[in-house]
From Swiss-Prot:
This is Large ribosomal subunit protein uL2cz/uL2cy. The keyword Chloroplast applies. Keywords: Chloroplast, Plastid, Ribonucleoprotein, Ribosomal protein. Gene3D superfamilies: 2.30.30.30, Nucleic acid-binding proteins (2.40.50.140), Ribosomal protein L2, domain 3 (4.10.950.10). GO terms for cellular component: chloroplast; mitochondrial large ribosomal subunit. It comes from Lobularia maritima. Part of the 50S ribosomal subunit. Belongs to the universal ribosomal protein uL2 family. GO terms for biological process: mitochondrial translation. It comes from the Eukaryota. Its main location: plastid.
């Protein structure tokens, strides 16, 4: 991804660093509208997730996470911007006439061919089961449950690594540093998700953040006691507690929130690093 820096005519352009423009002209049969999606409110209009709201209207693009068009070659026709994720997407024209969107693999260009199946080449963008991949392969869009579609390593720049295969399971090292077991029959896509430099962007102004549907974040220490446990005091005061807490009084910043009896607890060999 190319980062554009503009001449300093206004404060917003002086501090901004945005990616090069990738146009989006989605196909009508691969999109649908969403009503109040991502606004952080429930059915009664009550805020359930803070710091969300507003933003530009979006159309959801149907992404093929399953990659179940087996042994049918497809060609990358366009690389488009998707407002619902930080990764780009590709429009694929398959040999049987079907058209689908997939996540854009890093390095893929218009005109490249991809295929999914059991005995396909280990090539960027191809999807195949983990049992057919050599050790050390970089992968993304990884299935957890067979046939459900990819659920792991789907963000921009995400990449996992196949480090071992034993019995019915394969050992993966995920982008978070977690090492876990997954069935060897689950499929994944070879390569890394594109738009790697997304974390180098700087929006430059608050208005650009509002367009994305992100509301301002206010520190609890500057609130009143009625609004946050950290609030109150004369002037710039400390939080008045040994450890920070959430707005509802629960421990924050370091408290483990994962359920101990979750079914996948035995599949995680090493916990993710913070």
């Amino acid at each position: 991804m190319a980062i554009n820096l503009y001449k300093t005519s206004t404060p917003s352009t002086r501090n901004g660093a945005v990616d090069s423009q990738v146009k989006s002209n989605p196909r009508n049969n691969l999109i649908y509208g969403q009503h109040h999606c991502g606004k952080g409110r429930n059915a009664r209009g009550i805020i359930t997730v803070r710091h969300r709201g507003g933003g530009h209207k979006r159309l959801y693009r149907k992404i093929d996470f399953r990659r179940n068009a087996k042994d049918i070659y497809g060609r990358i026709v366009t690389i488009e911007y998707d407002p619902n994720r930080n990764a780009y997407i590709c429009l694929i024209h398959y040999g049987d006439g079907e058209k689908r969107y997939i996540l854009h693999p890093r390095g893929a260009i218009i005109g490249d061919t991809i295929v999914s199946g059991t005995e396909v080449p280990i090539k960027m963008g191809n999807a195949l089961p983990l049992t057919d991949m050599p050790l050390g392969t970089a992968i993304h869009n990884i299935e957890i449950t067979l046939g459900k579609g990819g659920q792991l390593a789907r963000a921009a720049g995400a990449v996992a690594k196949l480090i071992a295969k034993e019995g019915k399971s394969a050992t993966l090292k995920l982008p978070s540093g977690e090492v876990r077991l997954i069935s060897k029959n689950c499929s994944a896509t070879v390569g890394q998700v594109g738009n790697v430099g997304v974390n180098q962007k700087s929006l430059g102004r608050a208005g650009s953040k509002c367009w994305l549907g992100k509301r301002p974040v206010v520190r609890g220490v500057v609130m009143n006691p009625v609004d946050h446990p950290h609030g109150g005091g004369e002037g710039r005061a400390p939080i008045g507690r040994k450890k920070p807490v959430t707005p509802w009084g629960y421990p924050a910043l370091g408290r483990r929130t994962r359920k101990r009896k979750k079914y996948s607890e035995t599949l995680i060999l090493r916990r993710r690093s913070k």
